[in-house]
Amino acid sequence: NQFIHKLNNGFIIPNNLNNRLFNLLNAKYVLSLRSINTPGYKLVYQEGETKVFENANALPRFFYVKKVTYVNKERALETLFSNSFNPVKEAVVEMKGQTLGFKDYVGVGNIDVIEYGASRVVIQTDNQKINYLVFLDAYYPNWRVFVDNVEKVIYPTNYAFRGLEVPAGKHRVVFSFSVL
């Protein structure tokens, strides 16, 4: 994966664990044979020389962002790795031949996971205004999404993940994998 490779030539080593994009991988735990003294990491288990550290800064599986930058595929990685990109507050969304630019959202709301399986994920959302939902699970074209039984578009988000606009109010969002 080009995303992992770009982090540090394919290797995630203790000296780059504070990379803000590492937190975008939703990596809550890190195994290491060495101690990690990076802020935000706490040793939670050790057996022999193997240590397990908890990453307090790992982003959740689902979250809303305040800003979306719409780019073409060629600019996605460049935008993600720019010094100004903050994965906690914004997302980079790949668009094909559509209007590129920025869009602001509220970035606040409730997300409850109802069901999480290999080919079906169900969440309940509740937000006062339209929001952009980032789902830190691999983007793949065969995934479909339904908001209150109405099919919506899943966008490639932050290069490797999924995202979609969620309307204001309470909604049932169902992601399902289709081989057709």
Regions found by a protein language model. Give the residues of each.
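Active-site-proximal, structured, solvent-exposed surfaces of multi-pass membrane proteins
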Residues: 28, 59, 85-180
